[in-house]
Structures are given as C-alpha cells and as structure tokens.
C-alpha cells in the first residue's frame, strides 16, 4: 500500500525522524489558517501518489497566509499524471543548504534488503543512476544484523555525504530503518533529505510503501487506506476477507488456491481468443474454506461487476472436499436469489468429486453448467460471455 506524503511523515514522527511542522487539509481556507498558525513561510504540497509534483505545479512556496490560500486554490483539483489533488500538505518551509537522497527497499532480485544513498538529492533518483551512477551507493542490508549507527554512518559515507554531517545523518538513517522494519514496509524513501544552514538533517519529503501481507500485525494501518481511489468491488472483497483483484475482462473467476486461480486466468484468456477475445474479469481465491458464506461472498462481488458476463468456478477438492464446495455453491445461489443472474460454469475435481457433481446435477439450477475439465470449463465460460 503506497502512502501519501503526509501519512509517511506521520510514521516518521512516530519513530523520531526529524521533519518539518505541517498539517494536511482539503480546503484553501484551512491552508491559510494553518499557515497563519505556523507563523512562518510554508510549502503547499499536492498529496498524490506519483512523482513529478514540482514540475507539474503541485509544490509552491508561500511567504504569507494569503499566498498559501492562493496556491492552495490552484493546487486543489490539479491533475498530476492522471492523479487529481484532493488534499494538500501545508508544511513549514526550511532553508536548505544541501539536498541528499536515502531509501531502504526490498531487493527482490537479490533476496535481500537494500539501502540507497546519494549526495545528489532533490532530483529523480533514476536520473542520478543514469547520469552519475558513481554518486549513488547501493548497500545490501543484512536482515538479521539490521542497521546500527555505525552501519548507518557507513551508508552515508558511501553515498558521498560530507564528513561533517555523517554523524547527524547516521542518526536519521537509523531511524528510517526503524520505520522500514517496525512498520513492515517494502520501501522507505526520503528525497530530499536536507541539511539546513544550522546543520540540521531533516526529511522534507517522504515516500513509504507498506506490505499489505503484514497488515494483520498493523490494524492501525487501516486508516491509511485510500478509500476514494480503491475499486468498490475490491473494498467489498476485502471486507469479506477475500483475495480479490479486479481485471478488465468479461469472465469472472473463482478458484481455491492462488496457483490454480492463476492457471485458470491463463486458460480462460487462451480460450477467449476463440470467442471474440473475451478475457478474465478478476482474480478471486477463496482459499481452502469454500463454505456457503464464502462462496456467496465471492459470487456477490463478481456478479456485481457490470463487466462480468459469465462466471467460471474452478475448484480442486482437497481438505475441503468437492461435496462441501457443491453444497456451498447451491446455498450461495439460494442466498443471492435474484442477484445471481449470470451463467456459472463449474468444474470440480479431486476429493469427493463424484459426490460434488451429483449435488449440482440434482440441484438443477438453470444458471449452472458442469464441466469435466478445466479446458472445457474455460471454453464454455468464454462462449457464454461472448454470447451475452
């Protein structure tokens, strides 16, 4: 989950990372009041989850509260690379002597953590990597040893930060590592990390990505969710603890187990080439507990997707046997009633497959078609979607 800058800074404050005073708002009037309360020049900063805000006019210096009001009026509603500014951060402006770059991230390719540090801050780090690679330090971080003050100082030194700021920078770098670990982040980035004329080291910007797979350890992170930008179907699925991702096709997919669902997406996409190019509409893994309630919740989400024309239920019975899955489907259709109005193709295999198929045959629901194989089911679901 990507955070807005103001949310990242909330985590920074929580862990003692020095930053600048500021508050978030969604009105120009509040921006003026906040600026007056701060009593110093401020920065008005668009809160969008995309880079290039400054170049797009989303970051402005305001010397007075009236300037803050004017800039806030112009920035609120500003479109930055397709992201509409709905909130702004009003933060105290700081005098800057130098700008640096620091980040911690998950290096998936090398299966480790990585610290990146550069004396060339304030510009796109991709540009630094391309034009001045020798100025960007990439330092692997041992997950067990972590980052102590000595190692943090080494990171700053390898990033070519001036000798006179190494100790102060090390303190901030270690605290940023604390944010990374304690909050289960996959990215913590500060650009710029600044040195003031008074030799303070401050995080004047912040980017944090949280690992949603660790969300169970952080119920407090729920407040960071950007509800306005989240697909309502994905929100509904999350409320029911369903592993759901919306796609752009016409065939709804329900399966048990991520691997099976991924395979089903491929098979449906391939079958769709013979039926007008229809594609999978979603990824939905109901896991091992395919109860009536879980199946009903899954079908409810998929059937409320206007793009879905048919549904392919592909289940391999294991711990949860096929007869339990079949009963779940029958009961789910009863629960949904008239809301179940799109054809379902069901393929069962594995534990108690014969019993499961018998249950569905005897139920004789007009929307349900049985398939013997995954290929057959995918083809039938694609055919039904293309015909609607």
From Swiss-Prot:
One of its GO terms (molecular function) is ATP binding. Keywords: ATP-binding, Ligase, Magnesium, Metal-binding, Nucleotide-binding, Tricarboxylic acid cycle. It catalyses: succinate + ATP + CoA = succinyl-CoA + ADP + phosphate; GTP + succinate + CoA = succinyl-CoA + GDP + phosphate. Its cofactor is Mg(2+). Mg(2+) binds at residues 191, 205. Its EC number is 6.2.1.5. Residues 9-236 form the ATP-grasp domain. The keyword Ligase applies. ATP binds at residues 45, 52-54, 94, 99. Binds 1 Mg(2+) ion per subunit. The keyword Nucleotide-binding applies. NCBIfam families: PRK00696.1, sucCoAbeta. PANTHER family: SUCCINATE--COA LIGASE [GDP-FORMING] SUBUNIT BETA, MITOCHONDRIAL (PTHR11815:SF10), SUCCINYL-COA SYNTHETASE BETA CHAIN (PTHR11815). This is Succinate--CoA ligase [ADP-forming] subunit beta. It comes from Nocardia farcinica (strain IFM 10152).
């Amino acid at each position: 989950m990507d955070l807005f800058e103001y949310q990242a800074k909330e985590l920074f404050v929580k862990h003692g990372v020095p930053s600048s005073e500021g508050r978030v708002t969604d009105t120009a009037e509040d921006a003026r009041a906040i600026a007056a309360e701060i009593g110093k020049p401020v920065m008005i900063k668009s809160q969008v989850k995309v880079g290039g805000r400054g170049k797009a006019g989303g970051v402005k210096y305001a010397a007075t509260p009236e300037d803050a009001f004017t800039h806030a009026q112009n920035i609120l509603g500003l479109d930055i690379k397709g992201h509409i500014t709905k909130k702004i951060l009003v933060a105290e402006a700081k005098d800057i002597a130098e700008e640096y770059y620091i980040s911690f991230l998950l290096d998936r390719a090398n299966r480790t953590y990585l610290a990146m540090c550069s004396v060339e801050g304030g510009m796109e780090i991709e540009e630094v990597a391309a034009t001045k690679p020798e100025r960007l330090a990439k330092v692997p971080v041992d997950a067990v040893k972590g980052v102590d003050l000595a190692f943090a100082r080494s990171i700053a030194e390898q990033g070519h930060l001036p000798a006179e700021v190494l100790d102060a920078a090390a303190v901030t770098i270690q605290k940023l590592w604390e944010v990374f670990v304690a909050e289960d982040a996959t990215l913590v980035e500060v650009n710029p990390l600044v040195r003031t004329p008074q030799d303070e080291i401050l995080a004047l910007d912040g980017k944090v990505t949280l690992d949603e797979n660790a969300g169970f350890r952080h119920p407090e992170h729920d407040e960071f969710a950007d509800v306005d930008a989240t697909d309502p179907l994905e929100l509904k699925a999350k409320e029911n603890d369903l592993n759901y991702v919306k796609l752009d096709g016409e065939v709804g997919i329900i399966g048990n187990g991520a691997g099976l669902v991924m395979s089903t997406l491929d098979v449906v996409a391939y079958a769709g080439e013979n039926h007008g190019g229809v594609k999978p509409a979603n990824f939905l893994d109901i896991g091992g507990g395919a109860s009536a309630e879980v199946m009903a919740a899954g079908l409810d989400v998929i059937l409320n997707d206007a793009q879905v024309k048919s549904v392919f239920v592909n289940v391999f019975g294991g711990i949860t046997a096929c007869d339990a899955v079949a009963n779940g489907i029958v009961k789910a259709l009863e629960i949904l009633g008239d809301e179940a109005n799109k054809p379902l193709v069901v393929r069962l295999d594995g534990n108690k497959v014969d019993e499961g198929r018998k249950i569905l045959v005897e139920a004789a629901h007009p929307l349900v078609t049985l398939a013997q194989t995954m290929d057959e089911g995918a083809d039938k679901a694609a055919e039904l979607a293309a015909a609607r």
